[in-house]
Amino acid sequence: MLKSLFPKNPKLKNLNIPTIKLTYMKAANIFHDLRNISSKDIITKTELLKLLKKYCKIISPYDLMLATARMREEGKYVQANYREKYLEVYVKYFIMRVKEILDNNNYLDEAIDKESFDESFNLLKYQFEKERNDSIEEDKFPLIYIITALYTTFILEEPIHPVGTEFPGSLKVEEKNGEFYCPVKDKQKDNENAICNLCLAEQTPGI
């Protein structure tokens, strides 16, 4: 390719210029890679985290800026007295997870719940397509969404909405005796594609 830029330069006639091959990894490729590690009988946190780090590296500061702007736009439709809390939680635990994942080398390496992992594929692919913005070329928002859900569920073993997340009515995600409870979990129980089905929190009793 570079030789063709200087076809009349005799000094370049016998110059051996190596071919440069650029590999462009698309966000949707993550599902192919997830399927690959799913073929194993046992999947460790190290294997999954390595894959998540790989895809975090193709998320640029500009992608994070666009994702933050999108969440702020969606926040306009949240109740006014709940809006700032909503944005604080989602920006911190959604957008900022990318840096946390890249920096995370301190975790207990053990096998993840393979059955839940395998069952998550259709749900995650649905969410990926649902969150895609076709007006933005190679929109990374769906990728951030998927990475965050997998990281929180299988690496941290925490609910997708972090403890303390407040919902309208002053209801919150809670942890009691090592178990996680969400006040709105059952609202999505009939929606098989809801991300809540991946979340390990249980419905808060009595609500």
Role assignments for model-derived ranges:
Residues 7, 11-14, 21-24, 30-207:
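Cysteine-centered metal-binding/redox modules
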